[in-house]
């Protein structure tokens, strides 16, 4: 692709994302499906703006690579060891059972047994990018089903190695392409990467961090991610697996959070590019000429994988309420199928349109997953949001709550317990199934679902409630919920959790004045205790705390118009200096007033 063409493609991708994703979110079909539809629109079978899909699809795999690096950072080696049973037990069983069933079905449709085996293995894999994205959107990350889903995806990445090695054997060209010496060298190189990463990465990042230049740290992070991806690609292994291992090696380092911050913007954009590329690769010509075959194939693929995953989840002991989430989120074909089927095609394992039909099936199955997860959400909502069971003893029998609490993590639980202790009627909205199960056992009135859905808020009693307390983890969810409440339930008093100063500014701009910055109050309290240990009078330390809180809040309000304007940063610094001067002046006055206090104690 020429340089100018590459730039044009970049502009088209950005335009497609900016136009399609907000529209998809407004229609309630999710960002992932929006990216896929945008790819269809600008691809060779849509408006035809971009024709070189294969090159862009390979480049867009970097989105999955960055995502796996961040996931690796969140898992330390001891946690990975704890997951070994689910990785090599459930993960291996899912791949083998799904591949066997799907290969058998392909043989019934005139595939040779060699092509059927490759097709079955490729179709058994799930989309790492899509599954992890949906798990995050649905709040499954910390649930049992989310942990099990991640284990299955990790085993699938490990299975890439033997699957690719199997292709030349099935094609009957093992002598020509299957070099055991070369494989041994690759294994040694892989082990060398593990050992080198274990002992070299932290000293290298310590040296880079000592420079104090943030841009260099970001560049080093990108070098690590891209370098490990290219190294694994050169070995013929999964790029995503390489960056995942790099992330795990740095999971216990002091640079973990800084690495996440440096990578996050690139991950989001490249993941969007990946989904757009998948949409572009959909061959509408094959879909048109083999419509019935493709539709049946997609239905059978999704049904077989759901059946296998559901049964494995049941055998593993996953709660019944979480099994459908686990099965649904992994029910699609994956990006690895594109690589495996291309390799098999180069070995002439497929005949006629077989490869094109398989790729169309995989692509369409990926498009069904967001819709399938919405159906699962509706089913779970009916199951959990219906009338209370007789054996449950809720604290409150009144159907009209005074307060709705959105999110029941550590922050929300403290608020909920305080309100319950004072006999307030509350209803909790939570999208983590495991949390819903636990809270209901303790008698909380909990609704499962996405609180940004107006119907759920209405059924939870928002029209009769007096206040809503928003404790969402994601700032985007908080602001969306504020907008919905102001539009549909204007009578509600909105109280919100702000994760930081930027979110506090956004809440103030939206008209929300009752909010709490999650670390501010506790930091101030610890600061007050520190002043006392340094010899300051307790009353004086208390006054210092109150002054600081009041003046900081005043500065927060004064800087609302410029919080997002980088040109105004200098003004923020001036305001901070002013705050310090006012603080020192008032504290000097306090000291004069307190000079004689100690002698009376």
From Swiss-Prot:
Q: Where are the transmembrane segments?
A: 4-24, 29-49, 55-75, 87-107, 115-135, 152-172, 177-197, 207-227, 230-250, 268-288, 291-311, 324-344, 356-376
One GO BP annotation of this record: proton transmembrane transport
The membrane topology noted for this protein in its Swiss-Prot or TrEMBL record is: Multi-pass membrane protein
Pfam families, sorted: Na_H_Exchanger, TrkA_N
Key words of the record: Antiport, Cell inner membrane, Cell membrane, Ion transport, Membrane, Potassium, Potassium transport, Transmembrane, Transmembrane helix, Transport
Location of this chain's protein in the cell: Cell inner membrane
Domain RCK N-terminal positions = 400-519
Give the source's domain of life in one word.
Bacteria
For molecular function, the Gene Ontology terms on record are:
glutathione-regulated potassium exporter activity
Q: Which SUPFAM superfamilies match?
A: NAD(P)-binding Rossmann-fold domains (SSF51735)
Q: Could you tell me which InterPro entries the record lists for this protein?
A: Cation/H_exchanger_TM, K/H_exchanger, K_H_efflux_KefB, Na+/solute_symporter_sf, NAD(P)-bd_dom_sf, RCK_N
The record's listing under PROSITE patterns reads:
RCK_N
UniProt GO cellular component terms:
plasma membrane
Broad class of where this protein is predominantly found:
membrane
Give the protein family. Answer: Belongs to the monovalent cation:proton antiporter 2 (CPA2) transporter (TC 2.A.37) family. KefB subfamily.
Function text: Pore-forming subunit of a potassium efflux system that confers protection against electrophiles. Catalyzes K(+)/H(+) antiport.
Oligomeric state and partners? Answer: Interacts with the regulatory subunit KefG.
Q: What is this protein called?
A: Glutathione-regulated potassium-efflux system protein KefB
This protein's species is: Escherichia coli O1:K1 / APEC
Gene label: kefB
